[in-house]
Regions:
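Amide-donor transfer/coupling interface in amidating biosynthetic enzymes
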Residues: 73-77, 102-229
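Residue-level detector of functionally special positions within alpha-helical transmembrane segments
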Residues: 49, 86-87, 142, 203
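Glycine-rich nucleotide phosphate-binding loop and flanking beta-alpha elements
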Residues: 52-53, 89-91, 147, 171
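Short, flexible active-site-adjacent loop segments at beta-strand->alpha-helix junctions, enriched
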Residues: 88-89, 123
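N-terminal beta1-alpha1 cap of cysteine-dependent amidohydrolase-like domains
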Residues: 1-85, 92-99, 105-111, 118, ...
Length: 229
């Protein structure tokens, strides 16, 4: 199994992802620089968190114009597995691989804390090792995580079960209090219609080892391996 982790100027979570893939779940992994023109031999692309290009213009906007982003789009169109975490999620929306946009947090502040999220769809390649409606605790760290889309788009993704994760309390109840950024319907992560592209704001790579106090995030990566095998 070969994972490719994209590196943009300003990315800062690629090493965490690399460690989890290489040292925790023991899969082949390599970095792919933003001006590369090939994803040859890659089974799963990870677009990590950070501040690509300093978040200038708009989060993810400049990264979406890079050479590797064209390759990511083509890879996804062929059915390749793609996951975007935090800034990676923002980039995937800029690439139109996922619907909607990520706006400034409702509080207008950078938010860095643990959040509870509910598994809304456990039948995907990203969540098949989680139980349906399970509640896991995953940290967030972002200023633009306020997910928004039109009413028509929202109706569509609900009908197609594209909502994968939602913010909730420790009992699995969604509320405004449990929503850290103002995201519509408390959405924390969703997939494309085909189910091969996932974007989420929480950082599963930061809770994938016991030494970090939790392994709630590891099953996301293991689910991908399980599916692709």
């Amino acid at each position: 199994m070969n994972f490719g982790i994209i590196q943009f100027p300003g990315s800062n979570c690629e090493q965490d992802c690399f460690h989890v893939i290489s040292n925790v779940i023991k899969q082949n992994c390599r970095y792919i620089w933003h001006d590369s023109k090939s994803l040859r031999g890659i089974d799963c692309v990870i677009v990590p968190g950070g501040f690509s290009y300093g978040d200038y213009l708009r989060t993810g906007a400049i990264a979406a114009q890079s050479k590797i982003s064209y390759e990511i789009k083509e890879f996804a169109k062929r059915g390749g597995t793609v996951i975007g975490i935090c800034n990676g999620f923002q980039i995937l929306t800029e690439l139109k691989l996922l619907p909607g946009v990520l706006l400034r947090n409702k509080s207008l502040n950078f938010v860095c804390k643990d959040t509870y999220i509910k598994i809304e769809n456990s039948s995907t390649r990203f969540t098949q090792l989680y139980n349906q409606d399970a509640v896991i605790k995953i940290p967030i760290a972002h200023a633009e995580g306020n997910y928004y889309l039109t009413k028509k788009e929202l109706s569509t993704i609900r009908k197609r079960n594209q909502i994968i994760f939602s913010y909730c309390d420790e009992f699995g109840i969604s509320s405004e209090t449990a929503n850290p950024n103002g995201s519509i319907l408390n959405i924390a992560g969703l997939s494309n219609e085909e189910g091969n592209v996932l974007g989420l704001m929480p950082h599963p790579e930061r809770v994938s080892e016991n030494i970090l106090g939790s392994t709630d995030g590891i099953n996301l990566f293991k689910s991908i391996v399980n599916f692709l095998n």
